[in-house]
Design a protein with these regions (language model features):
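Conserved small/polar residues in nucleotide/adenosyl-binding loops
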Residues: 193-200
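Anionic-ligand binding patches
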Residues: 2-4, 10-30, 34-192
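Alpha-helical hinge/cap motifs
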Residues: 8-9, 200
Length: 200
């Protein structure tokens, strides 16, 4: 079974493809499938709702089984922000640096023990009109005082986990512990049984 990945984010697409390949999940981008998905309005109030919106749009546009990810960073000192607005936290066209710089400014002066945060990845996989799989992955960590590392994307340079920022990890190291890696391995397990799995 071949899946279409429902994203227009080139960096996220690269990471999804990198994680899916060794899991044995055959997935292609919209470009590879010769399809223009356009911009999908993410009107959900949760990661899961937005993942479904994106997967459903791709499924309806192509007729192919579709996989979509909606993810973001939730900072406890900011009452869970930026959350579902992580990608648009500093405006639609803001750079990654502008987004994480704004976040660092907002928690300036917050002590280390209160800089806890977590990344969430909600994956929706639509197999047919009547069958879908929804799974979540969560990775806990802390927000650093300064950005560190040159890898990854998004908020990776300021998210510390196990003593290093996500941006300091190799791709292989990050995939083993990241929210997205966790969620996609859950998806793989569900697909092996070819039946929807309850969210846990």
């Amino acid at each position: 079974m071949k899946f279409i990945i429902a994203t227009n984010n080139a960096k996220k697409l690269k990471e999804l493809e990198r994680i899916l390949k060794p899991l044995g999940i055959d997935a292609v981008s919209a470009k590879e499938a010769g399809v223009n998905l356009g911009e999908v309005e993410e009107t959900g109030t949760t990661f899961a709702e937005n993942a479904f919106i994106k997967a459903n749009a791709a499924f309806k546009a192509t007729g192919m089984p579709a996989i979509a990810d909606d993810s973001g960073l939730s900072v406890d000192a900011l009452d869970g922000r930026p959350g579902v607005y992580s990608a648009r936290y500093c405006g639609e066209n803001a750079t990654d640096e502008e987004k994480y710089t704004k976040l660092l400014e907002e928690i300036q002066g917050v002590p280390d023990e209160k800089r806890t945060a977590h990344f969430t990845s909600s994956i929706c996989c639509i197999l047919s009109d009547k069958e879908k799989i929804e799974v979540d992955g969560i990775c806990n960590g802390t927000i650093s005082h300064t950005p560190n590392g040159n890898g990854g994307f998004g908020y990776d340079p300021i998210f510390d986990c196990n003593g290093k920022s996500f941006a300091e990890l190799t791709a292989e190291e990050k995939d083993k512990i990241s929210h997205r890696g966790i969620a996609l391995r859950k998806l793989q397990a569900c697909l092996l049984y070819t039946s929807p799995s309850p969210r846990d």
